[in-house]
Amino acid sequence: MTSQTIKRYPMPMPFGWFAVSYSDELAPSESRAVHYFDQELVLFRTEAGKAVLMEAYCPHLGAHLGHGIHERSGTGGGRIEGNNIVCPFHSWKFSPEGECVEVPYAKNMPPKVAGKKCLKTFPITETNKVIWAWYHPDGAAPLWDVISHDEANSDDWSPQDRYEWIIHTHPQEMAENAADPAHFKYVHGTASFPEWETTYDGPIVRGLQVANMPTPRGEVKGSIRTGSAGPGQGFTKFEGIADTFLLGMTTPIDEHKVQVRFAFIQPKVHGEVKKGGVNSAIISNIVGQLEEDKPIWEHKI
């Protein structure tokens, strides 16, 4: 009698726009090593403020650009001089486009790197107070844009209330979960199966649920609007009881592990952020739902 090891179904690395950092986590002249898309990378911001995501290994002798040794190193990362990142090993300098622009001890630029793009870089955009990188396994240019949300970029809404998880699953599992209303009753304890109106426009998916929501003061008509643009960027807007906007971001670390970021914002009342009560309860409920989904995702095949 033989036994057979059951392995998780192999799913490819998805392509799209993915969050690699919150904007306020990366100051000018800072850098850090990151690992996304099953690759070692370095994320840095130039002195002028441009965010850059680049292959991590110097083409000279393979030093990691994201691990610096000098006082002028970025926080936990490589040294930034002007717009360039500097290799900690022999101080080769690389532009935001991945071109070697200086070998300080050489009279002439080595032919291997002269006038060439030596390191792969990723298309970057910043909106919703997030740094987004475009990943495609074949290096294709972006096929759609990151959706900018007025709420996420407005001072009339609260600062982001952020939550983060590392989950051993694949982005497709999470996408399928969002389109599976039947599990809400059994996993999340809802009284019934939610019904959604869904529209599709290329990579953009939008959903709408309108319902009467019970409150201590009686029923209140409310709505939940959802949307996504590819596997990396999703949003949910709750209206009715406690207006809440959720920016949900899923970024593949490798083929079996993702980083999930939730950023909640709520409208200010007379310039102030209303805390506690229903406002806090709705956020706790959503975070709790992810915690309920997590063990199922992590142990699926």
Task: Identify the function of each model-found stretch.
Residues M1-G16:
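Hydrophobic, proline/glycine-rich low-complexity stretches
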Residues Y22-E151:
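Rieske [2Fe-2S] iron-sulfur-binding domain
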Residues Y9-P10, A33, P123-T125, T250-P252, ...:
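A general structural signal for short secondary-structure junctions and capping/turn motifs
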Residues P14-A19, S23-A27, E102-N108, A178-P181, ...:
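Short Pro/Gly-enriched beta-strand edge/turn motifs at strand-loop
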Residues P14, C118, T125-T127, T244, ...:
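A short, structural micro-pattern
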Residues K50, G139-I301:
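C-terminal catalytic domain of Rieske-type non-heme iron oxygenases
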